[in-house]
């Protein structure tokens, strides 16, 4: 059974006040501020396995996993040992190292791409991939999908998901920038289509395909909540290359999470370029993009498309990423265990909400899950517009009641949660006990 955690958050409150004096909003990424759920964000002191400990000593069962990278759980021995060994050799060289070669060899072998280039974040990866696509094709326009989030490069902050979801929902149907500071001129170079609408994508490519350098997409959406592609939509994605456009899969979130070949391998997709992040750094800052040699050889110094980075291929990140992938590859049962746990979590959440009379629709694939607080049949939430109908107020109340019982869920209705290999059956039972209590209170049946 879960127990009510101590209500005080004195240390987090004090740190948040200090942070707001020196950092915009008191955080270094907006969703961490708890703006959509209320209350004080928890400042974390340490993390081990499936648990965080905040500055007030509260132990929290973690379903964020640093927003996806911690697929093995926090402080995994193999990752810790690899980083410690790398640290003994130095933190940054500004020169090539064996670690980046070994990780590149592993990524290419597991995913089937010919070449890979490491950068420092998912945003850098998608930004660089789009520049490469434009350089390779000689075209200007890109196509993205409403609610897909590809980082915060200007040209991609158009009808974006993630922390922009609430504001962007107000301009549904308009291809407008999702952030102040993004010039309309940039936004006009981004053509927006509805995710999971193959007819709309086909019509757009028929009309504008000759101008399109690339179509970028999340093979499984995670930042509008989890949205799973239909077979018809996947087929339409393959056809965009008939117009000479490149197909770019943003696997920053799904890469090595849904399978060793990511979502593209799981779904049978063969994009021209793939972007990665999160898991390939084992919890340290990283990004990468890769693809077939013909395209990747356009990247400097081999080709004319410039991209560089002082800390790209950082030896600590390379060591952590390589250790993570080695563990995943050495134990093929990990992915099956992750999926079983997450399916049971989804089923348990549905049952808890139903018992309390609370509307809930859960989307789940592999170890990714979103509990949409709305009345919709299972599997019917497939688009940005579908997700945007969720009751964010009900979610906020539920989130706080889960947090009060020591369950650390993503503090946004429009995010995926992530299950790790460190989660146990006992953790699952504790989570579902908490969910039954939270939904009973929300539905007035407690």
Curated annotation (Swiss-Prot):
Localization annotation: Cytoplasm
Give the record's keywords alphabetically: Cytoplasm, Isomerase, Porphyrin biosynthesis, Pyridoxal phosphate
* Principal location: cytoplasm
Q: Extract the Pfam families matched here.
A: Aminotran_3
**Keyword Plastid in annotation:** no
The first-level EC class reads isomerase
Q: Which cofactor does this sequence's record say it needs? A: pyridoxal 5'-phosphate
Q: Which InterPro entries match?
A: 4pyrrol_synth_GluAld_NH2Trfase, Aminotrans_3, Aminotrans_3_PPA_site, PyrdxlP-dep_Trfase, PyrdxlP-dep_Trfase_major, PyrdxlP-dep_Trfase_small
Provide the positions where the record notes the PTM N6-(pyridoxal phosphate)lysine: 278
Involved pathway(s): Porphyrin-containing compound metabolism; protoporphyrin-IX biosynthesis; 5-aminolevulinate from L-glutamyl-tRNA(Glu): step 2/2
| Single biological process term from Gene Ontology | protoporphyrinogen IX biosynthetic process
Recorded GO MF terms: glutamate-1-semialdehyde 2,1-aminomutase activity; pyridoxal phosphate binding; transaminase activity
Concerning its family, UniProt says: Belongs to the class-III pyridoxal-phosphate-dependent aminotransferase family. HemL subfamily.
Subunit info here reads: Homodimer.
**By what name is this protein known?**
Glutamate-1-semialdehyde 2,1-aminomutase
- What organism, scientifically named, is this protein from? Deinococcus geothermalis (strain DSM 11300 / CIP 105573 / AG-3a)
């Amino acid at each position: 059974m879960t127990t009510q955690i101590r209500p005080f958050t004195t240390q987090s409150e004090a740190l948040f006040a200090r942070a707001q004096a020196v950092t915009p909003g008191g955080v270094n990424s907006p969703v961490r501020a708890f703006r959509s759920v209320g209350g004080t964000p928890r400042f974390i002191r340490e993390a081990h396995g499936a648990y965080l400990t905040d500055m007030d000593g509260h132990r929290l069962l973690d379903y964020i996993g640093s927003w996806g990278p911690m697929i093995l759980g926090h402080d995994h021995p193999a990752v810790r040992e690899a980083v410690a060994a790398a640290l003994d050799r130095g933190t940054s060289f500004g020169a090539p190292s064996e670690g980046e070669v070994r990780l590149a060899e592993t990524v290419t072998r597991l995913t089937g791409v010919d070449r890979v280039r490491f950068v420092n974040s998912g945003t850098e990866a998608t930004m660089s991939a789009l520049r490469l696509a434009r350089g390779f094709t000689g075209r200007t326009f890109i196509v993205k999908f409403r609610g897909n989030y590809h980082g915060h490069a200007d040209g991609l902050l158009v009808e974006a998901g993630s922390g922009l979801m609430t504001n962007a929902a107000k301009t549904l149907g308009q291809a407008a920038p999702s952030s102040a500071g993004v010039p309309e001129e940039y936004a006009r170079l981004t053509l927006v289509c509805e995710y999971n609408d193959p007819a709309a994508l086909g019509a757009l490519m028929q009309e504008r395909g000759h101008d399109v350098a690339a179509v970028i997409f999340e093979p499984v959406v995670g930042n509008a909540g989890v949205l799973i592609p239909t077979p018809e939509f996947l087929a339409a994605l393959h056809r965009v290359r008939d117009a000479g456009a490149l197909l770019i899969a943003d696997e920053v979130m799904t890469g090595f999470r849904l399978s060793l070949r990511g979502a593209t391998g799981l779904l049978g997709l063969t994009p021209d370029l793939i972007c990665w992040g999160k898991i390939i750094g084992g919890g340290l800052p990283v990004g990468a993009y890769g693809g077939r040699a013909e395209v990747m050889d356009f990247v400097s110094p081999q080709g004319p498309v410039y991209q560089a980075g002082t800390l790209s291929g950082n030896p600590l990140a390379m060591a952590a990423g390589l250790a993570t992938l080695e563990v995943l590859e050495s134990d093929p049962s990990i992915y099956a265990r992750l999926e079983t746990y997450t399916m049971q979590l989804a089923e348990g959440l549905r049952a808890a909400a139903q018992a309390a009379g609370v509307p809930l629709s859960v989307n789940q694939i592999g170890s990714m899950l979103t509990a949409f607080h709305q009345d919709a049949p299972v599997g019917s939430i497939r688009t940005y517009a579908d997700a945007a109908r969720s009751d964010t107020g009900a979610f906020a109340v539920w989130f706080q009641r889960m947090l009060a019982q020591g369950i650390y869920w993503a503090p946004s209705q429009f995010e995926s949660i992530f299950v790790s290999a460190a989660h146990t059956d006992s953790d699952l039972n504790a989570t579902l006990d908490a969910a039954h209590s939270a939904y009973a209170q929300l539905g007035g049946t407690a």
